[in-house]
């Protein structure tokens, strides 16, 4: 009887070891199996038309495969019971075939001819479709302001800009005046709110409206870094101190297409930043244990 129990114990122990060794990662206690891992490696090699790899390339391939499977598992868990339809999968595959100038239906046949399990490929297609749905949801919360558009165009130095600014020039160069100019700077908020009593005892104010390219080079550098209603530091010039306060910046001769291009660029940048944070947070909150030998 003891011998029989020993045999049973050994049998179950071996089974548990075999089952554990078949798991290469856990994602929130959802297993990724060795078969899934091998299928993903084979799929990546087939899609990249790779026949053989060096040990270093094999390590890199393993890292890519396990990462894609972990990301995939997290996305499936996030999506829950919601389904990706067969029509969506078919359309995604057709889109890949079109981009690669392949006849419809030939991609899965190609993978099968390379002994690749098509389920691994379809699983990745599903995860990419989920990712697209996530990005679509994030994009609805993204807005681009006119100020952001102007800043982006101005920073490119590709368009002529008309600038209106107020220049405060000290009446002398004493230490007392320098302190007064710094105090003035701290009080300058909006151009329209500047009162003469703020500066008349120690400085004068000049209003200039002109194309940025027509302004003296030193001031161009200062003005480029300032948004409307922003003020420069107090700087020294000849026998006086100056402060520049930008009131308005108007971009000249910008077409609708150019404006739309900037809007799309800024929108995509914001979506990308939101997506990166979304996926980073997803990883941080997850329990991930990789048991694949390094």
Swiss-Prot record:
InterPro entries named in the record: OMP_Chaperone_SurA (IPR050280), Trigger_fact/SurA_dom_sf (IPR027304)
Disulfide bonds: none
Protein's UniProt keywords contain Signal: yes
Signal peptide, first to last residue: 1-18
Keywords, in A-Z order: Signal
Record's protein name: Uncharacterized protein RBE_0210
Organism: Rickettsia bellii (strain RML369-C)
């Amino acid at each position: 009887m003891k011998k029989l129990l020993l045999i049973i114990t050994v049998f179950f122990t071996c089974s548990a070891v075999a089952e554990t060794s078949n798991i290469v990662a856990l994602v929130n206690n959802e297993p990724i199996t060795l078969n899934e891992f091998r299928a993903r490696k084979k799929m990546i090699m087939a899609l990249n038309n790779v026949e053989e790899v060096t040990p270093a390339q094999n390590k890199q391939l393993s890292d890519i495969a396990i990462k894609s499977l972990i990301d995939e598992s997290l996305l499936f868990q996030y999506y829950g019971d919601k389904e990706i339809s067969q029509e969506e999968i078919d359309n995604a595959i057709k889109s890949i075939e079109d981009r690669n100038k392949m006849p419809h239906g030939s991609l899965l046949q190609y993978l099968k001819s390379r002994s690749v399990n098509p389920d691994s490929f379809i699983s990745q297609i599903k995860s990419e479709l989920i990712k697209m749905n996530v990005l679509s949801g994030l994009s609805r919360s993204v807005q681009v302001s006119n100020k952001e558009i102007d800043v982006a165009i101005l920073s490119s130095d590709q368009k002529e800009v008309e600038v209106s600014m107020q220049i405060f020039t000290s009446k002398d160069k004493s230490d007392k005046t320098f302190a007064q100019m710094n105090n003035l700077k701290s009080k300058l908020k909006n151009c329209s709110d500047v009162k003469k009593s703020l500066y008349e005892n120690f400085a004068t104010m000049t209003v200039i409206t002109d194309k940025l390219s027509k302004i003296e080079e030193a001031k161009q550098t200062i003005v480029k870094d300032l948004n409307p209603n922003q003020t420069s530091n107090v700087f020294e010039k000849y026998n006086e101190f100056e402060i520049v306060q930008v009131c308005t910046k108007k971009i000249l001769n910008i077409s609708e297409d150019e404006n739309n291009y900037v809007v799309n660029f800024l929108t995509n940048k914001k979506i990308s930043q939101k997506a990166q944070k979304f996926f980073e947070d997803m990883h941080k909150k997850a329990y991930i244990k990789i048991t694949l030998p390094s």
